Structure formats: structure tokens, C-alpha cells
From Swiss-Prot:
<feature type="modified residue" description="2-(S-cysteinyl)pyruvic acid O-phosphothioketal">
    <location>
        <position position="117"/>
    </location>
</feature>
<dbReference type="InterPro" id="IPR001986">
    <property type="entry name" value="Enolpyruvate_Tfrase_dom"/>
</dbReference>
<keyword id="KW-0670">Pyruvate</keyword>
<feature type="binding site">
    <location>
        <begin position="122"/>
        <end position="126"/>
    </location>
    <ligand>
        <name>UDP-N-acetyl-alpha-D-glucosamine</name>
    </ligand>
</feature>
<keyword id="KW-0961">Cell wall biogenesis/degradation</keyword>
<dbReference type="GO" id="GO:0008760">
    <property type="term" value="F:UDP-N-acetylglucosamine 1-carboxyvinyltransferase activity"/>
</dbReference>
<feature type="binding site">
    <location>
        <position position="306"/>
    </location>
    <ligand>
        <name>UDP-N-acetyl-alpha-D-glucosamine</name>
    </ligand>
</feature>
<keyword id="KW-0131">Cell cycle</keyword>
<dbReference type="GO" id="GO:0008360">
    <property type="term" value="P:regulation of cell shape"/>
</dbReference>
<dbReference type="InterPro" id="IPR036968">
    <property type="entry name" value="Enolpyruvate_Tfrase_sf"/>
</dbReference>
<comment type="similarity">
    <text>Belongs to the EPSP synthase family. MurA subfamily.</text>
</comment>
<comment type="pathway">
    <text>Cell wall biogenesis; peptidoglycan biosynthesis.</text>
</comment>
<dbReference type="GO" id="GO:0071555">
    <property type="term" value="P:cell wall organization"/>
</dbReference>
<protein>
    <recommendedName>
        <fullName>UDP-N-acetylglucosamine 1-carboxyvinyltransferase 1</fullName>
        <ecNumber>2.5.1.7</ecNumber>
    </recommendedName>
</protein>
<dbReference type="GO" id="GO:0051301">
    <property type="term" value="P:cell division"/>
</dbReference>
<dbReference type="GO" id="GO:0019277">
    <property type="term" value="P:UDP-N-acetylgalactosamine biosynthetic process"/>
</dbReference>
<dbReference type="Pfam" id="PF00275">
    <property type="entry name" value="EPSP_synthase"/>
</dbReference>
Length: 434
């Protein structure tokens, strides 16, 4: 078993560059299945385990996929298979994003019910509601969901009960080849939605209104391969913003898009963090003393749920009582118990977490419960006394490229070790950046 060992006490300084956005690239790779003519070439693709997984799903579906030098080339011009099996989908719920493209191309899709992070139930009912509105019949059973349409999908007016990002993406992709116009209301507004729409349009689709609550998709007969560059990862950028703030450091985050970070920036400035927009990205300077604030996660442009656990680590260092309320996913507080192991004064009250600070955190052995919790525990380790050992790194690798190496380059005392060689003594780790 691999672990990340971090010793607290260092201010982080320097420059770090964020990768292409994980939450943008996965639905875009899935949407590449829509192109029945030509190759799609995607650049700025992060080297993540989830990207390898979705690539394997596409290969199983009979697409040709080459991934090298942060570039993915996809040829989906051959006849596609219709089934994405459990062995792939169990690893990552984003695999369900192939359903809309398969349904549009083949008129049929059979997908194992999805896996991924253990964050509540995260149902796909809104996806299926959209497919049914466009004329598909849906059956769920034996661990699979199957959708099929006689003839072709038809444009429809669809209202989402909740602005689900995944449902917006899946329905938008399916509607590109439907007959007629689809109007998707109460759609998600995330930057990743806009990125997918830009890719679809580059392939020849007619998508308008992405980034607003109403998206119009006029169906076309065929889509073609295109070139597209993935937007920068706003969650990775936000994570390094917290790294600067929590250590009282000074970090320039290159390739960050300030407009995508407004809600994060607003809350951090409220805490006393100095944030400067520069041509290269965003510079973050941590204060000597952090102020307590309250945060409520919301769909975009509200505060992103994917930054909740990282901000929790930061608020543990704030002076006073802070509260985070989670409105997007249930059961996304599994990391609270791990923070308690580090001596945090923190408690759960319903859908909220109350923190009293500042906390004198102590290093401990902790387990990542999901992707963002993995990053949050490492961030907490940066300001803990002694050594923090974080396990279950499979979660971290789903969303961060060389996270420990990037932190080390900024001055953190941190190493990733394999348990077999963890006779690497604490002193050796402490000497890493002496």
C-alpha cells in the first residue's frame, strides 16, 4: 500500500501550473464517440487514472484511442459496441457519460450502474428522464441500465429537477444527433458544461446557451472529428489556493482562470487571504491570521462542492467558529472523522459541519475517503505537528497529477512511499527538503 507522508511547518512559496480539468475531459472524451467521421484530437489532457479508465471504456466500445504527451486522439468512425461493462464503470461513475453518445449513434446503450467516489447515492435518474423525453425506452435491472430507441431520438423540452452536471452533459451530447430541437431547462452552468458545448460545436453540433440555465440543441445529421484544448482545472487551482493560504505562503498558480474561481476567491478574501489576478494566473498570499467564515455549497456559480473538504482543512486554522453546509451531495462528510484523528475540534450537525479554531493539529495516520478528501488531509498535514500519513491514494490519483511532487517543489516536506519500503524512517523524510 502506498502512503503520502507529510511533515507540517513549512510555508509554501513559488509557482505551480494546474493541469487540464478532470471534470471537463471525461465527458468530452465520451462525447468523442459522436463523431462518425474523422479523428478527435484533445490537448491539455491530464494524466489521471480516470482518464485511463474512460479511454479503456472507449476501446471496449470499438473506438481507437491513443494517449501520449497530454494528448488523446480518438477515432470512433467504426461501428460501436453498445455495452460498457462493470469492470470499467465500477471504477468511475463518469463512465455513464458514454450513454448519451451511444444512444445517439447506435440507438441503444447498455451501461453497468456507475461507481466512483462514495459520496451518497448520486443517482442517474435525471439522465434517464432526459433520454425518455427524447423517445428512448429505459430499463434498469441486474446491475445494468439499458436505453434504446426505435428510429431516432427526437428533440424535446426537458426540465431538470436539479441542475445536475452529469445529466446536463449526457442529455446535451445525446441531443446533438436528435431530430429537431431540444431545450434543456434548469441546466447546470459549470465552466465544464461550456467546454463540452464548445467541443460539440467544433464537431459540427449546434449548441447554444451553455453556461446559462437554458441550453438549446438543434440536432444535426452527423458529427465530425475536431481539435480541442481542455480548460484548466479550477478545482486543482482552488486546492493550491488553499495550500498557499493554510501555510501562510505565497504561490502563483499558473494556467488558472480567475473567472472560474470567483466563489472560491470571494470566500478566501473574506478570510483575509490576499488574491491577485495576474497575466499568468492567480497569485495567493496567506495571512498571519485567518478569519472564520460560513460556506454553503451550491451549483455553479455558487461555491463548488468539490472544494468543500479542502476549505474545511483551511477553516480548521481560522480564528473563531466556522460552518460549512453541504447542499449538493449527501454523505460528503466522511473525512470529518479523519480530521478528528488529527485533533480537530469539529462536529457534524445534519448537513452542516461546525469547526472551532484555530486548531493545533497533530500528525496521524489517516485514510482518504474520496478524491477531494485525499487532498484535504494532505493540506491539513502541511500545518500539523509531526508526521501525517495519508493512505488510500487511489482516490487522489483520480483527480491530481503528481500532487506530492508539486507540493514538494513549493517547499513542503512530503514524500510518497510504498509500504514495502516504508522502513524509510521519519528522519529520512524530514531530510527531504532540509
Amino acid at each position: 500500500m502506498e502512503k503520502i507522508i507529510v511533515r507540517g511547518g513549512k510555508r509554501l512559496n513559488g509557482t505551480v501550473r494546474v493541469e487540464g480539468a478532470k471534470n471537463a475531459v471525461l465527458p468530452i472524451i465520451a462525447a468523442a464517440l459522436l463523431a462518425s467521421d474523422g479523428k478527435n484530437v484533445l490537448s491539455e489532457v491530464p494524466v489521471l487514472s480516470d482518464v485511463y479508465t474512460i479511454n479503456e471504456v472507449l476501446r471496449h466500445l470499438n473506438a481507437e484511442v491513443v494517449f501520449e504527451n497530454n494528448q488523446v486522439t480518438i477515432d470512433a468512425s467504426k461501428e460501436l459496441n453498445i455495452e460498457a461493462p462493470f469492470e470499467y464503470v465500477r471504477k468511475m461513475r463518469a463512465s455513464v457519460q458514454v450513454m448519451g453518445p451511444l444512444l445517439a449513434r447506435n440507438g441503444r446503450a447498455r451501461i453497468a450502474l456507475p461507481g466512483g467516489c462514495a459520496i451518497g447515492s448520486r443517482p442517474i435518474d435525471q439522465h434517464l428522464k432526459g433520454f425518455e423525453a427524447m423517445g428512448a425506452k429505459v430499463q434498469v435491472g441486474n446491475g445494468f441500465v439499458e436505453a434504446y430507441v426505435e428510429g431516432e431520438l427526437k428533440g424535446a423540452k426537458i426540465y431538470l429537477d436539479f441542475p445536475s452536471v452529469g445529466a446536463t452533459e449526457n442529455i446535451m451530447s445525446a441531443a446533438t444527433l436528435a431530430k429537431g430541437t431540444t431545450i434543456l431547462e434548469n441546466a447546470a452552468k459549470e465552466p465544464e458544461i461550456v467546454d463540452l458545448a464548445n467541443f460539440l460545436n467544433a464537431m459540427g453540433a449546434k449548441v447554444r446557451g451553455a453556461g446559462t440555465g437554458t441550453i438549446r440543441i438543434e440536432g444535426v445529421d452527423k458529427l465530425y472529428g475536431a481539435n480541442h484544448s481542455i480548460i484548466p482545472d479550477r478545482i486543482e487551482a482552488g486546492t493550491f489556493m488553499v495550500a498557499a493560504a493554510i501555510t501562510g505562503g505565497d504561490i502563483l498558480i499558473e494556467n488558472a482562470v480567475p473567472e472560474h474561481l470567483r466563489s472560491i476567491t470571494a470566500k478566501m478574501e473574506e478570510m483575509g487571504v490576499k488574491i491577485i489576478e495576474e497575466n499568468e494566473g492567480v497569485r495567493v498570499i496567506g495571512p498571519d491570521k485567518l478569519k472564520a467564515v460560513d460556506i454553503k455549497t451550491m451549483p455553479h456559480p455558487g461555491f463548488p462542492t468539490d472544494m468543500q473538504s479542502q476549505m474545511m482543512a483551511l477553516l480548521l486554522q481560522a480564528d473563531g467558529t466556522s460552518m460549512i453546509t453541504e447542499t449538493v451531495f449527501e454523505n460528503r462528510f466522511m473525512h470529518v472523522e479523519e480530521f478528528r484523528r488529527m485533533n480537530a475540534d469539529i462536529k457534524i450537525e445534519g448537513r452542516s459541519v461546525i469547526m472551532n479554531g484555530p486548531n493545533s493539529l497533530q500528525g496521524a495516520e489517516v485514510a482518504a475517503t474520496d478524491l477531494r478528501a485525499a487532498a484535504a488531509l494532505i493540506l491539513a498535514g502541511l500545518v500539523s505537528e509531526g508526521y501525517t500519513r495519508v493512505t488510500e491514494l487511489k482516490h487522489l490519483d483520480r483527480g491530481y497529477v503528481n500532487f506530492h511532487k508539486k507540493l514538494a517543489a513549493l517547499g513542503a516536506t512530503i514524500e510518497r512511499v510504498n509500504e514495502k519500503v516504508e522502513e524509510v524512517k521519519e528522519q529520512e523524510v524530514s531530510d527531504l527538503h532540509a
